């Protein structure tokens, strides 16, 4: 009976994960396409990408204040109310949150518009970035409202509107970015960057309209709601509850975003310091700083692919664990968390090793006119492993009401990162690599703190041989095959074909190595959609032996 119940909840959890993975993959592909196109447009390049991302980082900082913590919080509170049948309470949580965060988003939108000149001139030391921030400012209020909708639907274990809206937003952003930047060819680079970011605002407004229409058609049915003690809370008390959970999450996310802002500000200033003895022109120094910022942005775009897949586990984990704990089902919560941690490692390890093995070929293939940054890419790929695992553990910590821990961990990491950035980037022999090195140290700190706390609350059942050593052996073996394969193929074919064939070779070899090492148990395979059919196929071809005993 317990096995059947777990299998049912596992299937529901994995269904949401698969929906989010498909959505996130499509979003990242679209994001890569438009960044690839605009980066290779004449007059844009790494410098244009630097202006583009510098303004976007400041925008992201305010965006985090107004919206980043909202989906997780609303999702958690709504799922807890629905789990006990209190649909009226769930609906009330949505309404209180919507009013407050709409107001907050509006205030921050106005603040960014009128404060952009000061930030660009006095903090970033690149005045022209102000244009990018101004065109992004109206988007903040619409993102805040959209975030409440997404949390509301996520709390109902309905990931469809979140997936569709995010995909729609990125599609519109992709089409409009390319269109607007092309329309500005011949103008100054910062104008082209501002035009590219203007598309983000248009896309977000249209996405909000979609979510609003969906909400009007799919509101919760409150006619059969069960009364709970929550009904006696005033709106002020309810808002206090929402903020009590959302503030630690927001602070954690804010510090993570600050990590990016630290890079933007310190790279912009420290690169100018590092090269001040080589270049005397202020304009030339700004161009060097923006080019370095562009390289970081370019690398972030690539490493975000595996992280987007992994984020699906983290996002689905919050309501899944909250629901299980609300029902006093610690076993299910533990299994979901353990599987998500293991799955994160299985997904991100081969990607990291593949990126390290093919760093320069990948950059040359995707950014033929701006292919610098292979070393930065390799260091970021190592950090990506820890980032992915920290994402999953953060979702678990939110689910077990330990939302302050990621904030504390990120805060400690951010302070150390800032100090390292100032020391390393200002050294002309290290320069931009300093940002990647400090990011790695930052992720190590966050990972260690989050893991220790989460494991003390929920037994994660991490087995060294099965969950760590076997995936590492498979990923390293794949990396060797990919590296050798690329170099052999490249003797006869060009870079693009050689890189694509090496990636295909890597994917096939990794799957075979995973099967050969028996990294996935029967229970792991059963968690995957169509797991029963996959396992039967593996048994039929004697890759796995039939296991008769029931699931634990």
Regions of interest found by a model, annotated:
Residues 160, 171-209, 404, 414-448, ...:
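Membrane-interface helix-loop junctions in multi-pass transport and translocation proteins
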Residues 1-33, 88, 92, 230-256, ...:
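N-terminal membrane topogenesis motif
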Residues 1-2, 180-184, 202-231, 440-490, ...:
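C-terminal transmembrane helix end/exit motif
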């Amino acid at each position: 009976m317990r096995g059947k119940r777990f299998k049912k909840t596992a299937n529901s959890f994995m269904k949401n994960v698969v929906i989010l993975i498909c959505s996130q993959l499509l979003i990242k592909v679209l994001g890569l396409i438009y960044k690839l196109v605009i980066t290779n447009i004449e007059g844009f390049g790494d410098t244009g990408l630097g202006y583009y991302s510098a303004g976007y980082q400041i925008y992201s900082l305010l965006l985090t204040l107004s919206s980043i913590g909202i989906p997780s919080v609303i999702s958690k509170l709504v799922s807890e109310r629905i789990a006990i049948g209190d649909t009226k309470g769930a609906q009330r949580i949505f309404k209180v949150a919507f009013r407050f965060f709409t107001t907050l988003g509006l205030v921050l939108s106005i603040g960014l518009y009128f404060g952009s000149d000061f930030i660009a001139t006095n903090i970033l030391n690149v005045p022209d970035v102000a244009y990018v921030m101004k065109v992004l400012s109206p988007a903040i209020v619409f993102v805040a409202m959209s975030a409440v909708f997404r949390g509301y639907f996520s709390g109902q274990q309905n990931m469809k509107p979140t997936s569709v809206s995010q995909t729609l937003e990125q599609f519109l952003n992709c089409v409009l970015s390319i269109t607007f930047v092309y329309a500005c060819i011949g103008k100054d680079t910062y104008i082209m960057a501002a035009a590219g970011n203007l598309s983000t605002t248009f896309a977000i407004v249209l996405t909000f309209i979609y979510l609003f229409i969906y909400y009007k058609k799919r509101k919760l049915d409150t006619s059969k709601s069960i009364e709970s003690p929550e009904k006696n809370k005033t709106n002020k008390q309810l808002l206090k509850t929402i903020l009590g959970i959302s503030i630690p999450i927001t602070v954690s996310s804010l510090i993570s975003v600050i990590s990016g802002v630290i890079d933007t500000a310190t790279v912009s200033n420290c690169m100018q310091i590092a090269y001040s003895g080589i270049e005397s022109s202020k304009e030339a120094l700004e161009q060097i700083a923006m080019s370095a910022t562009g390289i970081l942005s370019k690398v972030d775009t690539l490493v975000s692919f595996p992280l987007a897949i992994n984020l699906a586990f983290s996002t689905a984990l919050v309501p899944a664990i909250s629901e299980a704990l609300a029902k006093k089902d610690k076993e299910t919560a533990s299994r979901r968390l353990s599987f998500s941690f293991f799955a994160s490692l299985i997904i991100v390890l081969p990607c990291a090793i593949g990126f390290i093995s093919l760093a320069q070929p990948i950059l040359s293939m995707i950014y033929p006119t701006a292919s610098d940054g292979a070393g930065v890419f390799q260091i970021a790929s190592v950090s990506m492993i820890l980032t992915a695992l920290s994402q999953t553990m953060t979702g678990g910590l939110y689910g077990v009401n330990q939302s302050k821990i990621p904030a504390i961990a990120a805060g400690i990491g951010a302070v150390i990162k800032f100090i390292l950035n100032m020391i390393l980037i200002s050294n002309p022999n290290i320069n931009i690599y300093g940002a990647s090195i400090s990011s790695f140290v930052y992720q190590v700190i966050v990972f260690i703190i989050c893991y220790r706390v989460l494991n003390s609350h929920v037994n994660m059942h991490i087995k060294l041989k099965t969950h760590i050593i076997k995936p590492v052996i498979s990923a390293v073996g794949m990396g060797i095959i990919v590296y050798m394969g690329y170099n052999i193929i490249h003797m006869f074919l060009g870079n693009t074909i050689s890189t694509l064939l090496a990636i295909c070779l890597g994917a096939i070899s990794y799957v075979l190595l995973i099967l050969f090492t028996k990294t996935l148990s029967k229970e792991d395979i059963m968690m995957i959609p169509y797991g029963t059919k996959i396992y039967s196929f593996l048994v039929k071809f004697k890759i796995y032996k039939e296991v008769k005993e029931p699931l634990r």
